[in-house]
Amino acid sequence: MLYKSIDEFVKVIDKKKRIIGLDFGEKKIGIALSDKTNLVAIPYSVYIKRSTRKDLGSLYNIFVENNVGSMVIGWPIELSGIESELCQKVVLLANRIIAKYKINIYLHDERYSTAMATRVAKLANIKRKESQSIDDKIAAMLILQQVLDIMKIYQI
């Protein structure tokens, strides 16, 4: 099921499984995973998009290999709060994942996540050229970590 409410999403999380976080872009998908305790988000990879079928298959392999039970996807709304064009693509992807793999997905406001990822890379003294290849997975990590921190409040 697709959730835009964190209140509803936290009720359906399988505590025994990990959570995957995605930063969905036009050409790439940043991927992060929670640790086994669902307390810490860890950058996982940057996936270069190919076709929907191949993308879904690759994501499924990650689900299985890492015991994933739920997903958080960055919701790319504009700074003004208006849904961006990419929002429709995110919903389409989310609905395809749900239909095919029966996984619960939460759409989390991702405003500033890419800017924060760039800042994190800069603070870690990672050169700009290098950081461009990891910004997406850092953004996914930041998005997922925000949700994990909220879950701590709910004591999930």
UniProtKB/Swiss-Prot annotation:
Any Pfam family matching the protein: RuvX
Q: Which residues form the signal peptide?
A: none
GO CC term, one of those recorded: cytosol
Q: Name one GO biological process term.
A: rRNA 5'-end processing
Alphabetically list the UniProt keywords. Cytoplasm, Hydrolase, Nuclease, Ribosome biogenesis
Q: Name one GO molecular function term.
A: nuclease activity
Name the InterPro entries on file.
RNaseH-like_sf, YqgF, YqgF/RNaseH-like_dom, YqgF/RNaseH-like_dom_sf
What class does this enzyme belong to in the EC scheme? hydrolase
Q: Which CDD domains match?
A: YqgF
Where is the protein found, in the record's own terms? Cytoplasm
EC number(s) from the headed UniProt entry: 3.1.-.-
Q: Which domain of life is it from?
A: Bacteria
Q: Family, per the entry?
A: Belongs to the YqgF nuclease family.
Give a short account of what the protein does.
Answer: Could be a nuclease involved in processing of the 5'-end of pre-16S rRNA.
Please identify the protein, giving its name as recorded: Putative pre-16S rRNA nuclease
What broad taxonomic lineage does this protein's source fall under? Bacteria, Pseudomonadati, Pseudomonadota, Alphaproteobacteria, Rickettsiales
